[in-house]
Amino acid sequence: MRTFVISDAHGYPELIKNALAHGGFDPLCDAFVYAGDLVDRGPDPEGCIELIERYAAEVLVGNHDVGVLLDLPIFPQESRGSGLRLFLRQKVLAASSAWRVATAVEGVLITHAGVSSHYDWVLQEECQGDPARLAGLLNATFVAAVEREPQVREWDDHPILSEDGPLWFRPRPYSYLLPLAGRAQVVGHTPPIPELEPLDFYMIDPCAFEGMADPGRYRYAVIQAGCVRVEEGRLGCDVAGQPLSKPCLAEAGR
């Protein structure tokens, strides 16, 4: 089975459709994990939500989603996102199929921003090197934070909400930290840094800040048999400039 990982559509459903179409995603035999940031920048976060509700097996939240969820002013932030606050809270606190901050697929750790070297000890000592246990710990800590609704001033020292946590982390040269050692990761949040792929840190942010002047572009990862590959490019477009979808994803455009 293949697992598609897509992130950072930011209100542009095309970034999800294009990735699934390019890879020939088949919901009958493939899985899809969405790795955060549905809101802000683009005009149609509801369209992004419709796609992930239909196709994603797991949904992770990103820092922009949490900005809406906990009423945190971040840049850029679109006013329409505030209307999704109750929806996001319900999803995060759902008893089953909850939206989370981390998951592990075939030994590969998936989060929105990445897990930093700050967590090396936690993975090895508290979780015995098991990425699934680390994901469970991160998720439990996140849910507890959402239930408590911490003030912004408390975020700096919070293990999930701080700049070193899996919602906000940016690796060198943006911070002093490197990715968690010895564990493959697929992440969004930060524009790709190719030099980090040899560290098994695979970055799939499609750079929604560039807009959709190129309507067929995509960037995503596929996990299969414990290996990760990143795909980036653009679909062929018809004369109207609309992406040409593959047949198995025809319904995604309806």
Model-derived segments and spans:
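Core catalytic region of metal-dependent phosphoesterases/phosphodiesterases
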Residues: 2, 6, 11-87, 91
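Beta-strand-turn-beta hairpins that frame and shape the catalytic cleft
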Residues: 1-4, 103-110, 198-199
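Active-site-proximal loop/helix segment associated with metal-binding centers of metalloenzymes
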Residues: 108-177
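Short hydrophobic-aromatic micro-motifs
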Residues: 5, 59, 108-117, 185-187, ...
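Active-site environment of divalent metal-dependent phosphoester hydrolases
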Residues: 10-14, 40-43, 64-70, 116-118, ...
